[in-house]
């Protein structure tokens, strides 16, 4: 038992997929961003920029530990990379991610043009194609590095 981690850049469709999959499988679904936002008393999705990623990762680890007490297995959607100011990809610490009880990793991908449309529709924000392409590349690279380092299967 453990966490089935579904990764991918912003707007790729992680939450949309997992809402449906959770309903079908009866396996609960949580969003890393939502767990952090609830703890920080922020409105989820309001701000994509992270000021203190190390603190947020510590919060996420704590929230995951709490969830595992009630749910021995669940889906978690999240990221290996986030944007910092200026829409520059920022890699999350792999040592923190290694503490999150992942049993499997699924990396979702979509065409950058589709991701741009999804983000415009969902968040009302315009990102440059170059920034989304850079985020996708960083996310994919980190997913593979993490999987190799931890021997957690990546699909």
Task: Identify the role of each PLM range.
Residues 44-84:
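Conserved nucleotide-sensing/catalytic segment adjacent to the nucleotide-binding pocket
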Residues 14:
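Conserved lysine of the Walker
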Residues 11:
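Walker A (P-loop) phosphate-binding loop of P-loop NTPases
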Residues 19-60:
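Conserved substrate/cofactor phosphate-moiety recognition/catalytic segment
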Residues 79-122:
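ATP-dependent NMP and nucleoside kinases share a basic, alpha-helical "lid"
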